[in-house]
């Protein structure tokens, strides 16, 4: 999966989960996103570093990576990212739809 698509999907799931008492982190599991656990952990760490999410604990050990998403949440900056990129997503879907209909594009 494209890196930015994965980031967008994570943020979108967290935004949708704001209406729930507890976020189900299985919605953004590496298997769901189609990425390795290591890449997924790096996505979460980077997103936390830039302020899009908070509440994530990432620990790297010799045996692998451990990620605690119990308190994961989207931040205001993460919501702004979603808002700014929603137009890009709409354009992408429109282009993809045209490409599916018109052969050779």
Tell where the protein language model's regions lie, with residue ranges.
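Short amphipathic alpha-helical interface segments
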Residues: 3-32
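Generic structural signal for hydrophobic core residues of well-folded globular domains
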Residues: 11-17, 47, 82-85
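Short acidic DE-rich linear segments
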Residues: 98-105
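Short, surface-exposed loop/turn segments at secondary-structure junctions
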Residues: 25-30, 59-65
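Short amphipathic alpha-helical interaction segments
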Residues: 33-56, 69
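Amphipathic alpha-helical interaction segments
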Residues: 21, 51-55, 85, 89
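Short, amphipathic alpha-helical interaction segments positioned at domain boundaries
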Residues: 62-97
